UniProtKB/Swiss-Prot annotation:
Residues annotated to bind NADP(+): 121-125, 202, 225
Subunit composition and interactions: Homodimer.
Enzyme nomenclature, EC number: 1.1.1.25
Protein name: Shikimate dehydrogenase (NADP(+))
Enzyme category, top tier: oxidoreductase
Annotated Pfam families: SDH_C, Shikimate_DH, Shikimate_dh_N
UniProt superkingdom: Bacteria
Keyword Thylakoid in record: no
CDD domains: NAD_bind_Shikimate_DH (cd01065)
């Protein structure tokens, strides 16, 4: 069995370690690699997949939306999000799925106060997460027009970008941008003032991000990107192989690797 994650850049991905851990635990013989695919090479790569050179692929920035025209059909969540992070075979069809939202929803399941959420960013991950959130969602993005478009698609609202936004209305705040990831590891997308919200960051390298460190220092509850990463990967793995992976094992392996790197 041959699997891969594609993106540009892609060298930072921990997906190979996670999926190969699960393959071994399931007694399956397979290989999972990272492939740096630039935009103009995406269609040619999908043609390789169609020749059964791969049994499944994961998709990350910047291809989550760009890959859609090259697939046969989309799962409902991917169609709603307009973004794909998993491509798998269903018979002779290449199917696009989006497990970002369900992965985040499972990670958030123990938090019962999610009635008014702020989502920072309006890219593929945000589009996957927004429809899975309970209650009202407000979208904030550096390009306000994009925030308004994405919010309107899901019947939600948008606010103009501001690092000093009044956070008092929100009980959950989710960073879906790359702010906090290298090379911007010393930056945060917002200033955490006058809030009691759960602070979430989908970034898993580094962990915790500066945003989460500041949240902890302020006595706030936090949710890092590791569990979401593992849960969305687990849903992809099940589509690829038909096997349910060990979530605890996956989280343990990833956290250990992050601590050592």
């Amino acid at each position: 069995m041959q699997f891969a994650v594609i993106g540009h850049p892609i060298a930072h991905s921990l997906s190979p370690m996670l999926h190969e851990t699960w393959l071994k635990a399931a007694g399956l013989f397979g290989c999972y690699t990272t492939l740096d695919v630039e935009g103009d090479g995406l269609e040619a790569f999908v043609q390789k997949v169609r020749k059964r050179q791969f049994d499944g692929i994961n998709v990350t920035i910047p291809h989550k939306s760009a890959i859609i025209p090259f697939l046969d059909r989309l799962e409902p969540a991917a169609a709603r999000a307009g973004a794909v992070n998993t491509v798998y075979w269903d018979g002779e069809e290449l199917v696009g799925a989006n497990t970002d939202g369900t992965g985040f929803a499972r990670a958030l399941a123990t938090w019962t106060n999610a009635k008014n959420s702020l989502v920072i960013g309006a890219g593929g991950a945000a589009r996957g997460i927004i429809p899975m959130l309970p209650g009202h969602v407000t979208v904030m993005n550096r390009t306000n027009q994009t925030a308004e478009q994405v919010a309107a698609e899901f019947g939600q609202s948008a606010v103009p970008w501001s690092r000093t936004l009044d956070l008092t209305p929100y009980d959950v705040i989710i960073n879906t941008t790359s702010v906090g990831m290298a090379p911007a590891i010393d930056q945060t997308p917002i200033e955490l003032t006058a809030t009691t919200a759960l602070i979430c960051d989908i970034i898993y390298r580094p962990t915790p991000t500066r945003l989460l460190r500041e949240a902890t220092a302020n006595g706030l509850d936090t949710l890092d990107g590791v569990l979401m990463f593992v849960l969305q990967a687990a849903e992809a793995f099940e589509r690829f192989t038909g096997h349910k992976p060990d979530i605890a094992l996956g989280e343990q392996v990833i956290r250990k690797q992050l601590e050592e790197s």
